[in-house]
């Protein structure tokens, strides 16, 4: 019986100058996705993917490393300028933005897109430790 060849999707080298860096910073993790202006993903990374586990994922240093890795992925496609959208209340917001600048990307704009409820769902009860 002949085995069917498995086709894998090859990464295309896009030549993109401008893009958007989406930083989602929660209390437990930081996820950085860099897309082109249409929304197609060029590169992404998270604190967990970089190698941090447990409570270390929520640190600013983990966010810095994740942003660095995502920027390196995106710069292989020729990315130079980036607009930053930040979502969430986590500790890695500023560290991730600084890391994008240090990696060699020019930050044009920083926008906070944290969703704020107009008195929607009831929040979880307060923790008593």
From Swiss-Prot:
<dbReference type="GO" id="GO:1990904">
    <property type="term" value="C:ribonucleoprotein complex"/>
</dbReference>
<keyword id="KW-0689">Ribosomal protein</keyword>
<comment type="subunit">
    <text>Part of the 30S ribosomal subunit. Interacts with proteins S7 and S18. Binds to IF-3.</text>
</comment>
<dbReference type="InterPro" id="IPR019981">
    <property type="entry name" value="Ribosomal_uS11_bac-type"/>
</dbReference>
<keyword id="KW-0699">rRNA-binding</keyword>
<keyword id="KW-0694">RNA-binding</keyword>
<dbReference type="Pfam" id="PF00411">
    <property type="entry name" value="Ribosomal_S11"/>
</dbReference>
<keyword id="KW-0687">Ribonucleoprotein</keyword>
<dbReference type="GO" id="GO:0019843">
    <property type="term" value="F:rRNA binding"/>
</dbReference>
<dbReference type="GO" id="GO:0006412">
    <property type="term" value="P:translation"/>
</dbReference>
<dbReference type="InterPro" id="IPR036967">
    <property type="entry name" value="Ribosomal_uS11_sf"/>
</dbReference>
<dbReference type="InterPro" id="IPR001971">
    <property type="entry name" value="Ribosomal_uS11"/>
</dbReference>
<comment type="similarity">
    <text>Belongs to the universal ribosomal protein uS11 family.</text>
</comment>
<dbReference type="InterPro" id="IPR018102">
    <property type="entry name" value="Ribosomal_uS11_CS"/>
</dbReference>
<comment type="function">
    <text>Located on the platform of the 30S subunit, it bridges several disparate RNA helices of the 16S rRNA. Forms part of the Shine-Dalgarno cleft in the 70S ribosome.</text>
</comment>
<dbReference type="GO" id="GO:0003735">
    <property type="term" value="F:structural constituent of ribosome"/>
</dbReference>
<dbReference type="GO" id="GO:0005840">
    <property type="term" value="C:ribosome"/>
</dbReference>
<protein>
    <recommendedName>
        <fullName>Small ribosomal subunit protein uS11</fullName>
    </recommendedName>
</protein>
